[in-house]
């Protein structure tokens, strides 16, 4: 994944930019540019492909980009790839406004997406900086080494937060327990089985109530799941032998 990603908020327009390899712009088997498929076709992601898929992805179904497009007044996609700058735009829930075109040259790589939510689809289109920043910080903990910059450029609300953690889940533990009495340093480990990577960290404190934060594909699973059930069993087994 890219080493840096930024999210800007101005005039209630979201702008997300990264320094990755840039979304693919070559022709898809369906006869349209791949970037267009990403933003107009459900389940078009490659997160479950074992060859050429994503190493890191968010969510499960591969619908994020196309759903954002469907629920936006307009979307503008800019891609820096192979020495060229590409741009494509949509409006009114995904209608193509301008075809993918080359608008310049570049010596960098990455993608930038700007969009404005369709106010007819939501009760409010005013964004909470706190919620966006909180999610960005979680991502930074889970994707160690990635720098996330969140900026609010709305008049009278200007602020910026930068999140960057080289120690990932260890840093997450330290953040969660910074005002608590702990009994040891955070313990972190990871493993791979059947192409599924699992990362885990834990730390015992003087609190009676346990707190478990579980994620799948960097999305919080507040309702738990088999991954959380397995973690609870393993920590209880560890406690019984302590």
Locations of regions flagged by a protein language model:
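Short, solvent-exposed loop/turn segments at the edges of secondary structure
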Residues: 1, 106-110, 195
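Short, small-residue-biased leader/transition segments that mark boundaries at the very start
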Residues: 1-6, 237-241
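Ser/Thr-centric signal marking residues that sit
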Residues: 3, 109-111, 221, 235
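Flexible hinge/switch segments at interdomain interfaces of large molecular machines
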Residues: 9-10, 104-114, 202-217
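GHKL-type ATPase core
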Residues: 10-34, 45-175
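Short basic (Lys/Arg) and small-residue
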Residues: 38
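Histidine-centered active-site/metal-ligand motif
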Residues: 43, 61, 227, 241
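GHKL/Histidine-kinase-like ATPase module
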Residues: 97, 130, 137-139, 145, ...
């Amino acid at each position: 994944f890219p080493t840096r990603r930024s999210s800007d908020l101005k005039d209630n327009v979201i702008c997300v930019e990264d320094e990755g390899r840039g979304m693919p712009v070559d022709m898809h088997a369906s006869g349209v540019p791949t970037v267009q498929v990403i933003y107009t076709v459900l389940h078009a992601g490659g997160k479950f492909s074992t060859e050429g898929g994503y190493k890191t992805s968010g969510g499960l179904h591969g619908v994020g980009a196309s759903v954002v497009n469907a629920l936006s007044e307009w979307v503008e996609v800019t891609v820096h790839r192979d020495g060229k700058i590409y741009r494509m735009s949509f409006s009114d829930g995904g209608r193509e406004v301008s075809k993918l075109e080359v608008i310049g040259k570049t010596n960098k790589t990455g993608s930038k997406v700007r969009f404005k939510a369709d106010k007819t689809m939501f009760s409010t289109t005013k964004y909470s900086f706190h919620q966006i920043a909180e999610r960005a910080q979680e991502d930074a903990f889970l994707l160690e080494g990635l720098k996330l910059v969140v900026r609010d450029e709305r008049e009278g609300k200007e602020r910026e937060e930068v999140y960057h953690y080289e120690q990932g889940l260890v840093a997450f533990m330290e953040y969660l327990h910074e005002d608590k009495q702990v009994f040891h340093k955070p313990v972190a480990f990871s493993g791979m089985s059947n192409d599924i990577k699992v990362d885990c960290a834990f730390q015992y404190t003087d609190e009676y109530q346990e707190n478990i934060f579980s994620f799948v594909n960097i999305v919080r699973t507040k309702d738990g799941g088999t991954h959380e059930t397995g973690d609870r069993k393993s920590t209880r087994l560890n406690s019984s032998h302590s």
